[in-house]
């Protein structure tokens, strides 16, 4: 699939411009979402039932549950979702292994992303909790990660759900190499603009990065031929953004056919 980055010409050629452009557009999701207006906090049977599930899954008791209840009500008053839906979101987070403090600090980013993107809370919770784990981030980073996803999806031909599917396959490898969530989102956005999306993008990106990180045979020869390296002369890892810029510089001047050949040699085929 990464062979399709014979579109590599257009994709990598414009990577530099788009990288800086997306970077400047990481505007807080929360601004627009809070403006949706205050919706009455729905309590009662649904809310109590949902909070009971949270208690059962998370093991939270006493003052912890009081804090979670209060937070759920707060989310019900400041987002388009009800307090009961906020409680359901907490249940998804608890199932992902988040503890009370994680849920208290992370729920706002998840709910704001769900509201801004139109995705349901279950999908959004899965995307955020899984990706934060892969990139070694904490629950308190959920708001920042939500902003990254919202900005990248609005500036590329993709959406939060498809980006989440890509992250599912690629994030563990990207995170293990120390690549940032920001740079990863930009790479995924660029691939989406080249017509490579969702799980296809995830498996392609995972394969490409794995090939470059542990090159053998054809890949090692191609990296030497085109002067591609994941590390600088001192052995320090380049960031993913620097790697993309390196690919743009080394391959951007090739003909379309040569770029397709380079892509096949460097990234392999899924």
Task: Tell where the protein language model's regions lie, with residue ranges.
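Membrane-penetrating hydrophobic segments
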Residues: 5-30
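Alpha-helical protein-protein interaction modules
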Residues: 245, 250, 255-258
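Glycine-centered helix-coil hinge/cap
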Residues: 24, 261-270
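Short amphipathic alpha-helical segments that mediate assembly, nucleic-acid/protein binding
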Residues: 86, 259-260
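Small-residue helix-packing and pore-constriction motifs in hydrophobic alpha-helices
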Residues: 25-77, 88-96, 103-117, 123-156, ...
């Amino acid at each position: 699939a990464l062979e399709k980055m014979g579109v590599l010409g257009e994709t990598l050629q414009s990577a530099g411009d788009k990288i800086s452009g997306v970077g400047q557009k990481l505007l807080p999701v929360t601004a627009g979402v809070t403006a949706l207006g205050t919706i009455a906090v729905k309590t009662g049977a649904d809310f109590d039932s949902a909070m009971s599930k949270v208690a059962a899954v998370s093991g939270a008791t006493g003052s912890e549950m009081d804090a979670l209840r209060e937070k759920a009500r707060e989310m019900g008053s400041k987002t388009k979702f009800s307090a009961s839906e906020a409680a359901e979101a907490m249940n998804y987070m608890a199932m992902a292994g988040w503890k009370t403090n994680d849920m208290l600090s992370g729920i706002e980013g998840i709910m704001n992303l769900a509201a801004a993107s139109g995705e349901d809370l279950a999908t959004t919770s899965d995307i955020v909790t899984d990706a934060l784990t892969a990139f070694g981030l904490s629950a308190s980073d959920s708001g920042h990660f939500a902003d990254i996803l919202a900005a990248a999806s609005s500036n590329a031909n993709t959406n939060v759900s498809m980006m989440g599917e890509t992250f599912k396959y690629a994030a563990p490898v990207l995170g293990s190499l120390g690549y940032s969530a920001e740079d990863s989102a930009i790479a995924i956005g660029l691939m989406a603009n080249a017509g490579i999306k969702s799980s296809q993008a995830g498996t392609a990106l995972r394969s490409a990065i794995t090939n470059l990180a542990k090159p053998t045979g054809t890949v090692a020869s191609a990296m030497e031929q085109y002067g591609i390296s994941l590390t600088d002369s001192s052995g320090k890892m380049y960031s993913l953004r620097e790697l993309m810029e390196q690919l743009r510089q080394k391959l951007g001047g090739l003909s379309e056919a040569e770029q397709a050949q380079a892509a096949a040699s460097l990234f392999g085929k899924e």
